[in-house]
Amino acid sequence: MRAGASAPARRPWFNLSPMNRRRLDNFRRNRRGAWSLRIFLVLFACSLCAEFIANDRPLIASYQGELLFPVFVDYPEDKFGGFQARADYRDPFVANEIKAHGWMVWPPIRFANSTTILDPPTPLPTPPTWMLSDAQCRAALQKQGVKDAATAASPCWKLEPLWLGSDQDGHDIVARLIYGFRISALFGLILAGVSSVIGVFAGAVQGYFGGWLDLMMQRVIEIWSSLPHLYILIILSAILAPSFFVLLTILLLFSWVSLVHVVRAEFLRARNFEYVNAARALGLSNAKIIVKHVLPNAMVAALTFLPFIVNSSISTLTSLDFLGLGMPPGSPSLGELLLQGKSNLSAPWIGLSAFAVTALMLSLLIFIGEAVRDAFDPRKTFS
C-alpha cells in the first residue's frame, strides 16, 4: 500500500439490505415497540440469572480461609460441623458457624422459589413486610430469638423483607415471580421457535410442490385443526406425568398449524415468479430454490406472527397451570399463583402480583408484535 493511501473500510460481519435496513429503522422509530423489546429483554435476562438474584444459598462464602461458592456447589453440612446432609445456610447453626470463621455474600433476595419461610410474622399467607404493624414484627422477632425485640424502635426493619409477601405455602412471592417469569418466557420462546420451524417447513413443501401433495396435506391439516384441542390437552395432561417437556410436546402437536397457511400462500404466489423459473433453468435443485430464493420472502410474513405465537404459548401455559393441569406441583408458575390468588381473596397481594407480571409480559409481547408487523409494512413509516 502506498504511503498516504487510506486503508479500506472494514466491512461489518453482517450486511443488511436496504429493505431490511428500512425495516429495522421503522422498528426503532416505533418507540412503544422498541422500548417494549428493551424492557422484555432486561426482564428475561434478569430471570435467566434468577439464582443470583433470589436464592437461599450465598453467592460466595469464606470458611476457615477456604473460598466457597454455594450457589454452584452443594456442600454437605458436616463441612461446617453439622450432619451429613445438604447445608442449609439459613439454619442459625450453619449461619453462625460460617460468620464466626468467615463471611457470606448473599443475593438481594434470600429466598429461592421453593424456600419455606420459617416463623412467619403472621399465619400464612403472610402479607408484605411494609404492611405489618410494629406489634406483629416484634412478635416475629421474639419467635426468632432476637434480643431486645420488645423494645426495638423499628422492628420491621430487622425482619427479612418480604416485599410482596408470601403465598399460602410460605414461599416468597418475589422469588416465585422471577422463576415463574423465566419458565413462562422460555416455554413460550421454545414452543414458538420449534412450532414455527415445523409450520414453515410444512407450508413450504405444500406451496412449492402443490398438486396432490398440497391437496393431501391440506386435508390432513384441516382434519387435525378441527379436533377439540382443549379437551385433548386436558386428557393428555391428566394421563401423562406433568413436566416442562411433556407440556411442550403436547402443545407442539397443535401449535405448528398456525403458520402453515401463511407460508403456503407465500410459496404458492412465488413459485411461478421469473426468478424461480430462472433458477430452475440454471439447474438448481428444489431444496436450494426453496431455501435461498423463496423462503427469505416467505419468512417476512412468518416473522410478523412470531411474537403473537409466543404470546399465545405463554397464555396457554398460564391457563393450564391455573386449571391445575400444567407444571408439576411446587413448580414456580404464574398460573399457579393466580390460582392461589383466587383461593385467597383475603390475601390480595398474591393475585395482584401474579396478574401484574402476567399482564406486563403479555402486553410487552403484543407491543413488540405490533411493531414488527408495522416495520414490515411498506405503507407505514415512522418519523
Q: What do the predicted segments below correspond to?
A:
Residues 166-383:
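Alpha-helical transmembrane segments of integral membrane proteins
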